[in-house]
């Protein structure tokens, strides 16, 4: 893929929404291309997160606590929290096909965010919005569970 196509792929990812083109092109150009064989892990739950991956080609099985939780397809962004901070991966991602990725390390993201502060702020805003929406969804589920408990007491 070309840098322009890869930058457009990045733009389709929610945390890069509303970001300027130039920092996305820089990330697309400098991201390390990695290929994974069938059955090879891109990331392993509990291991130190070192990078995020944009899935360019192929499919990836996703597991959490040894249970299948889904399949990622091209355009998926895996391990986004690794890009912005340290910590362990929350899932295991295993190649189902031969997989091509663009690997975005924490260091790469920080360099681009330092050079383009508006880019870093836009990503932070998008992540904050995602976190807010996740908390709202959890609150909705909590209310539903509370109601179901009250109903079961009848």
Describe each model-derived feature in a short phrase.
Residues 1-154:
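Cytosolic regulatory regions built on CNB/CRP/Popeye-like sensor folds
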């Amino acid at each position: 893929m070309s840098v322009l196509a890869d930058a457009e792929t990045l733009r389709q990812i929610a945390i890069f929404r509303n970001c300027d083109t130039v920092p996305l092109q820089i990330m697309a150009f400098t991201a390390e291309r990695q290929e994974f064989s069938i059955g090879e892990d891109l990331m392993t739950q509990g291991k130190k997160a070192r990078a995020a991956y944009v899935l360019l080609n192929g499919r990836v099985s996703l597991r959490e606590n040894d249970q299948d939780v889904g399949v990622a397809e091209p355009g998926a962004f895996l391990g986004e929290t690794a890009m912005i901070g340290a910590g362990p991966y929350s899932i295991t991602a295993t190649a189902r096909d031969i997989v091509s990725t663009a690997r975005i390390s924490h260091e790469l993201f920080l360099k681009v965010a330092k050079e383009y502060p508006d880019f870093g702020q836009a990503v932070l805003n998008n992540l904050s919005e995602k976190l807010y929406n996740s908390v709202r969804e959890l609150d909705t589920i909590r209310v539903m569970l509370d109601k179901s408990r009250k109903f079961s007491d009848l």
